Amino acid sequence: MFNSVNLGNFCSQTRKDRTSEFGDRTGCASNIYLPSCTYYVPEFSAVSSFLPQATSRQISYPYSTNLSQVQPVRDVSYGLDPASKWHRSNYASCYSGEDLVHRDCLPPSTMTEMLMKNESVYSHHHHHHTHPGSNHPSAGFYSGVGKNNVLPQGFDRFFETAYCSSTDNQSDICLQKGEGGKQESDSQQPQQPQQQRQQPSAALAGASEQEKDPGDEEEQTNSGSCSTSSPAATKEGNAGKSSHSSTPRTRKKRCPYSKFQIRELEREFFFNVYINKEKRLQLSRMLNLTDRQVKIWFQNRRMKEKKLSRDRLQYFSGNPLL
């Protein structure tokens, strides 16, 4: 310990000598390491700083001392201040603050998040030409990608087909729905006779769906395969269809059966495939259904059972091992 004290005094003396002899080379004194000197920490606190004070010699610099403060290299390399990065500074005049935030952040996990982030920025810059009454649910969602150069120019052709321009004709608007993005145009009326032509074949082939509403089931029974319908009823149904073909047909709302109703109807069908009137009235009262709904459900269920038995027969006949 006494060696450290003596050596500390020696170090302080040599330090004072060095500052007096080599005043113009003050920057080199702090880099000298003396192996024989024990660096005693309290001794260093009493020593004055090596930096040039007002009493020491003034050093003349070849450059002007009133330069602007340079940002440390450490901040630039680690990106502590992303708004003032040197490689981002040329974008400041072209993009808004929200654009810079999106570009400096990490890329989002999915393409949808990136497109949704750019939607609000794109709508401010490029959507001044759209009509106020046009229905554009996802125009900014798609067109914001190819136009503000988030993706390369080669991807523009994929986004041009996903939205409408709405500058030529306001009536031709793309309504992109979650199920398939169908286009609603003036071609609805030619499609109505085609749908009505498909209904008789659907009634013959697969009219055994359990959850049919009474209006659709009435059309199926009138179109064929029902012995209870009279010829006058079929003529009225055909006349009604011809009148419907001229006007757009509105589909009735479907009212599917509940699980309890289906379970009770299936139980009765298991015992009796053909139901009598008394049992039918009893079921309709118990299940809170009409007499006609119970009758049509049994008709559809018999058609379904017939189709299942036919498929089952084809399956077993096609496999000789079974």
UniProtKB/Swiss-Prot annotation:
Low complexity: bias regions: 188-200
Pfam families hit by this protein: DUF3528 (PF12045), Homeodomain (PF00046)
Molecular function per GO: DNA-binding transcription factor activity, RNA polymerase II-specific; RNA polymerase II cis-regulatory region sequence-specific DNA binding
Residue ranges, annotated region (Disordered): 121-141, 174-255
InterPro entries recorded: DUF3528 (IPR021918), HD (IPR001356), HD_metazoa (IPR020479), Homeobox_CS (IPR017970), Homeodomain-like_sf (IPR009057)
Disulfide bond annotation, renumbered to this chain: none
Residues of the DNA-binding region: 250-309
Chain ranges passing through the membrane: none
Keyword Cell membrane in annotation: no
Bias type Polar residues, positions: 221-232
Localization terms from the record: Nucleus
Keywords assigned: Developmental protein, DNA-binding, Homeobox, Nucleus, Transcription, Transcription regulation
SUPFAM superfamilies (UniProt xref): Homeodomain-like
GO CC term (a single one): nucleoplasm
Family membership: Belongs to the Abd-B homeobox family.
PANTHER family listed in its UniProt record: HOMEOBOX PROTEIN HOX-A11-RELATED, HOMEOBOX PROTEIN HOX-C11
Role, per record: Sequence-specific transcription factor which is part of a developmental regulatory system that provides cells with specific positional identities on the anterior-posterior axis.
Protein name as it appears in the record: Homeobox protein Hox-C11a
Gene: hoxc11a
